[in-house]
């Protein structure tokens, strides 16, 4: 019965995608994502008796037309006040990594592929997380891509939790990350939904969350494990920390 519900949801999701005006070169990719998600969902259900929550796939399908696989559609989402605030933290000796179980539709979808509890990762320059940033879907407020985040936003759903870690970083390393984020903010960005499923990147500033975080750490010489950024998952930052480079700070939620 659950398999039939999943199948029905996929059909409706495909119809939604087909009837929504889309860039011509993107339309087949949207349908490919729906088809791939359906096949993967059936496989997961068969092996683990797990499927997406009711309405989850429809929510994802409705958001698909907001994405672009070829163009930068997010520009200037981080205001000057963000950079001013981040500048004040460059001397504190750490960058902060935050893993989130947000209970959102996208998080549940990613969980089908990672089989992990925490499916989003963010970066902040300060302990109070006032400079929280990552790649996300924009929550229907901003365009998918590089966006500021807030603890209240990430933990608004029942059962959502966050795990906070800190990574030692020099002034110059934090500066390198901040300057790179500023560059992306000016050039533009988009969320790498295609790469999330097929592990490809079509343009440099089109990334998903863990790809972005790893790219920033690597840019500053702070990556403490070696992996192609497009293959990095949020929990890799914990599971591949063989030398205990991170310090656990606390749990939120």
Give residue spans per PLM region.
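Cysteine-nucleophile amide-bond enzymes
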Residues: 1-253
């Amino acid at each position: 019965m659950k398999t039939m519900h999943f199948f029905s949801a996929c059909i409706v999701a495909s119809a939604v995608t087909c009837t929504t005006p889309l860039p011509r070169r993107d339309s087949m990719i949207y349908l490919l994502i729906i088809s791939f998600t359906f096949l993967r969902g059936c496989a997961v259900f068969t092996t683990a008796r797990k499927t997406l929550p009711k309405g989850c796939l429809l929510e994802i399908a409705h958001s698909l037309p907001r994405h672009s696989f070829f163009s930068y559609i997010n520009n200037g989402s981080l205001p000057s006040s963000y950079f001013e605030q981040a500048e004040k933290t460059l001397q504190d000796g750490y960058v902060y990594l935050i893993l989130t179980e947000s209970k959102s539709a996208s998080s549940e979808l990613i969980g089908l592929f990672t089989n992990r509890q925490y499916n989003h990762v963010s970066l902040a320059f300060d302990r109070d997380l006032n400079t929280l940033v990552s790649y996300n879907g924009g929550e229907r407020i901003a365009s998918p891509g590089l966006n500021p985040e807030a603890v209240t936003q990430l933990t608004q759903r029942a059962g959502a939790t966050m795990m906070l870690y800190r990574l030692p970083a020099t002034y110059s390393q934090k500066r390198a990350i901040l300057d790179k984020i500023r560059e992306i903010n000016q050039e533009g960005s988009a969320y790498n939904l295609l790469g999330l499923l097929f592990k490809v990147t079509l343009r440099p500033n089109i990334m998903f969350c863990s790809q972005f975080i790893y790219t920033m750490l690597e840019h500053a010489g702070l990556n403490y494990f070696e992996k192609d950024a497009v293959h990095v998952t949020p929990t890799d930052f914990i599971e591949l920390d063989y030398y205990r480079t991170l310090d656990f700070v606390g749990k939120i939620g």
